[in-house]
């Protein structure tokens, strides 16, 4: 009887979390490559090797790794995400920027205006980007249905209280709504460390007045 009650309580808690909270994911440094740059880094016509699917539909981590280099230093074994994009983009944390000797701007993914140059290399080749290095702005991917439920809209800026081991309210969180998304909040590892993130951490949206 006690086990049954515990199962019921756990199910109720899970349902409440899904209704009121959003699951948080921490994203490490990574690279999105254009078709042209895949050819330069791995060879003409090379196909990236899918390693595992990510939470967002159609997105996946690849087996391939690259090195990124700035004026002060390099970071090896940076994961490549697929599929290919129109333009190459490198997403790092502010701490990574210190290692590289670069103060990368905080930008939304895909907005390359004002981003920095960076070198990407493998044992087969290298690419010198004129732009593309950024720190990703913290954001929430959201389905239209969930956007309606949480009463938010695409590109809206909200606060989000992350219930990690050290609960923390983040300001300047951008909502991104699309039929192609699953609902997750994305932060980088600097932010994850600040709030004591662990797998299963959730966040609550706080609407701005």
Swiss-Prot record:
Free-text domain note: Formed by 2 beta-barrels, each is capped on both ends by short alpha-helices.
Manner of cofactor binding, per the entry note: There are 2 Zn(2+) ions per monomer; Zn(2+) and CoA bind inbetween the 2 domains in each monomer.
InterPro entries in the cross-refs: PTAC
BP GO annotations: propanediol catabolic process
NCBIfam families: BMC_EutD_Gpos, PRK15070.1
Residues binding Zn(2+) 2, per UniProt: 139, 141, 186
The species this protein was found in: Clostridioides difficile (strain 630)
Purpose: Involved in 1,2-propanediol (1,2-PD) utilization within the bacterial microcompartment (BMC) dedicated to 1,2-PD degradation by catalyzing the conversion of propanoyl-CoA to propanoyl-phosphate.
Subcellular location: Bacterial microcompartment
Requisite cofactors: Zn(2+)
Homology family: Belongs to the PduL family.
Pathway: Polyol metabolism; 1,2-propanediol degradation
Reaction(s) the record says it catalyses: propanoyl-CoA + phosphate = propanoyl phosphate + CoA
EC number per UniProt: 2.3.1.222
A GO cellular-component term linked to this record: bacterial microcompartment
Keywords: Acyltransferase, Bacterial microcompartment, Metal-binding, Transferase, Zinc
Binding-site positions, phosphate: 85
Highest taxon above the source species: Bacteria
Protein name: Phosphate propanoyltransferase
Predominant localisation class: other
Positions annotated to bind CoA: 26-28, 72, 193
GO molecular function: acyltransferase activity, transferring groups other than amino-acyl groups; metal ion binding
UniProt-annotated binding residues for Zn(2+) 1: 30, 32, 91
């Amino acid at each position: 009887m006690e086990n049954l009650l515990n199962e019921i309580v756990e199910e109720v808690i899970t349902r409440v979390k899904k209704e009121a909270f959003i699951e948080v994911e921490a994203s490490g440094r990574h690279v999105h490559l254009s078709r042209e740059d895949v050819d330069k880094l791995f060879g003409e016509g090379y196909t990236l090797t899918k390693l595992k699917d990510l939470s967002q539909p159609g997105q996946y981590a690849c087996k391939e790794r690259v090195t990124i280099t700035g004026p002060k230093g390099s970071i090896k074994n940076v994961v490549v995400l697929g599929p290919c994009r129109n333009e190459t983009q490198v997403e790092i944390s502010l701490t990574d920027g210190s290692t590289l000797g670069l103060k990368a701007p905080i930008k939304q993914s895909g907005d390359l205006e004002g981003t920095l140059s960076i070198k990407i290399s493998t044992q087969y080749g290298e690419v010198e980007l004129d732009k593309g290095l950024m720190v990703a702005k913290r954001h929430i991917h959201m389905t239209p249905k969930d956007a309606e439920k949480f009463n938010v809209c695409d590109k809206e800026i909200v606060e989000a209280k992350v219930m990690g081991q050290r609960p923390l309210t983040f300001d300047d969180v951008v909502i991104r709504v699309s039929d192609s998304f699953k609902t997750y909040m994305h932060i980088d590892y600097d932010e994850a460390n600040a709030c004591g993130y662990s797998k299963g951490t959730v966040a609550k949206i706080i609407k701005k007045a």
